[in-house]
Design a protein with these regions (language model features):
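Rossmann-fold NAD(P)-binding glycine/threonine-rich loop
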Residues: 78-81, 85-136
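Short amphipathic alpha-helical segments
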Residues: 6, 68-72, 94-95, 134, ...
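NAD(P)+-binding Rossmann beta1-loop-alpha1 motif at the extreme N-terminus of oxidoreductases
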Residues: 1-34
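Short beta->alpha connector loops
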Residues: 61-64, 126-128, 150-152
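Rossmann-like NAD(P)-binding element
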Residues: 36-81, 87-94
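Internal alpha-helical scaffold of NAD(P)-dependent oxidoreductase catalytic cores
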Residues: 113-120, 138-177, 181-186
């Protein structure tokens, strides 16, 4: 199924990125206004997304995850599916970034510990946005690796990924997020 970015937002209403200091979304305003008018989508603070969303894409820089979740209100993530698109990368010394996760302490695991009542699924963190919702490659259908502790949450993420056009391989529990995160260094 070919899905445009607008169709993706219309179907899954999600979000987004932030300007870390102001708890506001930071996307192309023209796109957001058009999306809002055409699809009745809405924008808001991290807190509003956490309260409203049932499936939330967490797309911050790795070092901004804790602030984004804390600003949102940890309690608002209870029973929500959190698709963790983050990577544990430190860009403070420039490029290439430093990989900061260790076995047993991946960013996915840290997020799950921070919001224990949420259902965190690591996915989409090793691909570029231009193929995220339309992964058509000459070589064939690509495989998306996922990991998480809740089987229903992983089914939700699998459905989203398959709607986009991905084959999905479930690596197991959230402790496997380290293996997926480590692949980000190959992509960068």
């Amino acid at each position: 199924m070919d899905l445009s970015l607008t169709e993706f937002f219309e179907k899954w209403v999600i979000i987004i990125r932030s300007d870390n200091n102001k708890n506001k979304f930071n996307l192309n305003q023209t796109f957001l206004i058009r999306l809002r008018i055409q699809n009745n989508a809405s924008i808001g603070t991290f807190s509003e997304v956490a309260e409203f969303g049932e499936v939330i894409f967490l797309c911050t820089l790795g070092n901004a995850v804790q602030d984004a979740i804390t600003l949102s209100g940890i309690e608002k993530f209870s029973n929500k599916v959190i698709i963790d698109v983050t990577n544990p990368l430190d860009f403070s010394q420039g490029l290439p970034p430093k990989f900061t996760a260790t076995i047993g302490n991946s960013l996915g695991e840290e997020i799950q510990r921070l919001i224990p009542e949420a259902h965190v699924v690591k996915a989409f963190n090793t691909i570029s946005v231009n193929i995220m919702v339309n992964p058509k490659l000459e070589e064939g259908t690509p495989t998306l690796l996922i990991s998480g502790n809740n089987s229903d949450a992983k089914k939700t993420v699998t459905t989203i990924a398959e709607d986009f056009g991905w084959e999905v391989e479930d690596l197991g529990g959230i402790e496997q997020a380290f293996l997926i995160e480590a692949q980000a260094m190959l992509w960068i």
